[in-house]
Amino acid sequence: NVPVARQFVLLEAAALAVTGTLSLYADGFRIKWPNDIYYKDRKISGTLSECNIGSNGITQCIIGIGININQQMFTSDAPNPISLAQILGAESDRKEILDQLIYSMEQYLRKVSEGQFDDIHTLYQQKLYRANGRHRYRDNNGEFRAEIENIKPNGHMILKREDGTLSEYAFKEVTFI
């Protein structure tokens, strides 16, 4: 069982499984907090999740992962999509990628079931998009520059602003610019 306070580890595991799978094809995939996967400054994958909570922790969690594999053109209003085919210059076998993703997800879920939360969290932080340097962000008070100080085990992101102030954000409370 995963304690409620550590449910973010399931999203970390999923993000690591996706980056690990895609890294078999090319280098440079990073996790954009909390769970999108980027190649350079373009989004290749997104994840949605819904977890049920019981008295002993997480009882069930459904994780949906979308990966742009062979798309050459995008018709959505997403501002920065990219596909594996665009990166590689050739199409890939979707079944092969799915099999590799399932295998990788099973490996990470095994680590979760063994309680290796801190190991997964460390790996997640090592793969973060924009992990180094100051970047532009926006919250309810406007735009600012900051660097990622930490991602807490509960999934909150700590940003260190240029004046040294630390700000903590839950999902959707801050936007990368």
Identify the function of each model-found stretch:
Residues 3-5, 12-29, 39-177:
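Long, positively charged amphipathic alpha-helical accessory segments at protein N-termini or as interdomain linkers
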Residues 31-33:
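Short loop/edge segments at beta-strand edges and connector loops
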